[in-house]
């Protein structure tokens, strides 16, 4: 590599894509050297001087390392939009999250955030429904939505799965979804499960007078099969499909977004596998950026963490991810490594809090997230002493209490399902 891309006097253009990285150089490598090599490898340069890289080409496409802070090991790089294929998340990641993670000159490297210029944002449609559209589908305008995951994760027959879903719907759940590792196994085939569970959702709607949504997992071994399963759901009358975003991949997600828009189905995004590369604060890619890419592509709702449940993620991090999902304009937050982003009118995603939640946590969830959240419970519903329907009822009762500013203990005096939930889960 023959060039120095460190350029602290550079002012990014409105058309530049900007990345923030955390960089820890290898022994014997300066912070500036690691930064310039990373910038070159993620754009136009190679490990040695190449005659095919003309001065004219370099001047037009070279990256600019315009911010360096060795104390916090933070670097920001501005890239010309001409380096990227418009409308392609995979190509962007191949550049700024590709070979650079294999370089020997860094011990650790983390891509914290990307600011996309308006010229690139225009090539993406964002969520088809998003938060406001999901509220229209479900018919709930003024409270958090309540959902559950059918448990156990796997092992139930299609008939048993539908029965569990029915009990959850009847007890008060707005949404019932498959777990991430349930797709099309021999004990619970995709098409039979979808047909039976969508039928019982209709039954629960008729009985309760509320809309009931089943989120069936269409994660599949090929894009063709994934889209076929989407069509099956549409033919069965579904309003939703669920997808495991990381195992499925970015190209498949962009393909799915187009097909789902054609069919008029909302997309629920499960983030399983993300922690393989997001959890280490010194290496990998941030969950905030994963959320940003999901909104860019156009998923309608996304798991973001809970703060109070079993999943990793402190309050500041989770709320930064929430803001990236819902705000029209995200302000920069250097402490959380968040870059400013004007979303250019793309719809907000509905944040989903899920993982290790019980009805007793609803006051805290409501205090943290407010009304614009989907509260999703697994064991916190199905492990209720009185069964799944009672677990769902306890969640709705705890939510009603929180909305009315009443303590759970007081509300439980006239609500036996909540009383039983307090007896099981409330910390003594």
Swiss-Prot record:
Enzyme class: lyase
Cofactor, how bound (note): Binds 1 Mg(2+) ion per subunit.
UniProt xrefs under InterPro entries: RuBisCO (IPR033966), RuBisCO_III (IPR017712), RuBisCO_lsu_C (IPR000685), RuBisCO_lsu_C_sf (IPR036376), RuBisCO_lsu_fd_N (IPR017443), RuBisCO_lsu_N_sf (IPR036422)
Family: Belongs to the RuBisCO large chain family. Type III subfamily.
Additional observations: Because the Archaea possessing a type III RuBisCO are all anaerobic, it is most likely that only the carboxylase activity of RuBisCO, and not the competitive oxygenase activity (by which RuBP reacts with O(2) to form one molecule of 3-phosphoglycerate and one molecule of 2-phosphoglycolate), is biologically relevant in these strains.
Function: Catalyzes the addition of molecular CO(2) and H(2)O to ribulose 1,5-bisphosphate (RuBP), generating two molecules of 3-phosphoglycerate (3-PGA). Functions in an archaeal AMP degradation pathway, together with AMP phosphorylase and R15P isomerase.
Record's subunit section: Homodimer. In contrast to form I RuBisCO, the form III RuBisCO is composed solely of large subunits.
Protein name per UniProt: Ribulose bisphosphate carboxylase
Gene: rbcL
């Amino acid at each position: 590599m023959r060039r120095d891309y460190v350029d602290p006097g550079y002012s990014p253009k409105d058309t530049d894509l900007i990345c923030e990285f955390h960089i820890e150089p290898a022994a014997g490598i300066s912070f500036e050297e690691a930064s310039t090599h990373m910038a070159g490898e993620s754009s136009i340069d190679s490990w040695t001087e190449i005659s095919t890289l003309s001065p004219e080409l370099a001047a037009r496409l070279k990256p600019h390392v315009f911010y360096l802070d060795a104390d916090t090991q933070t670097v920001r790089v501005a890239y010309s939009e001409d380096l990227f294929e418009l409308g392609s998340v995979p190509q962007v990641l191949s550049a700024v999250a590709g070979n650079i993670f294999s370089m020997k000159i860094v011990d650790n490297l983390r891509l914290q955030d990307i600011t996309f210029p308006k010229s690139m944002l225009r090539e993406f449609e964002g969520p088809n429904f998003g938060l406001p559209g999901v509220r229209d589908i479900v018919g709930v305008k003024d409270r958090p939505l309540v959902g559950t995951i059918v448990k156990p994760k796997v092992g139930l027959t299609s008939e048993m799965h539908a029965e569990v879903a029915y009990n959850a719907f009847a007890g008060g759940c707005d949404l019932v979804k498959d777990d991430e590792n349930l797709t099309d196994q021999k004990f619970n085939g995709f098409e039979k499960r979808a047909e039976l569970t969508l039928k019982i959702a209709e039954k629960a709607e008729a009985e309760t007078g509320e809309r009931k949504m089943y989120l069936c997992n269409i994660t599949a071994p090929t894009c063709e099969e994934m889209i076929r399963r989407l069509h099956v759901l549409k033919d069965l009358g579904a309003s939703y499909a669920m997808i495991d975003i990381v195992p499925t991949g970015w190209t498949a997600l962009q393909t799915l977004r187009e097909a789902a828009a054609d069919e008029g189905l909302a997309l629920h995004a499960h983030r399983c596998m993300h922690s393989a590369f997001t959890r280490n604060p010194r290496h990998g890619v941030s969950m905030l950026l994963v959320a940003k890419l999901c909104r860019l592509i156009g998923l309608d709702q996304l798991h973001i963490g809970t703060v109070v449940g079993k999943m990793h993620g402190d309050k500041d991090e989770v709320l930064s991810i929430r803001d990236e999902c819902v705000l029209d304009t995200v302000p920069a937050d250097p402490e959380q490594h968040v870059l400013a982003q004007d979303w250019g009118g793309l719809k907000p995603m509905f944040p989903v809090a899920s993982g290790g939640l019980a009805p007793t946590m609803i006051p805290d969830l409501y205090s943290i997230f407010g009304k614009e959240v989907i509260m999703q419970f697994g064991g916190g519903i199905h492990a209720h002493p009185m069964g799944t329907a009672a677990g769902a009822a306890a969640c709705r009762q705890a939510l009603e209490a929180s909305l009315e500013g009443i303590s759970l203990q007081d509300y439980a005096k006239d609500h036996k399902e909540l009383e039983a939930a307090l007896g099981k889960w409330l910390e003594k």
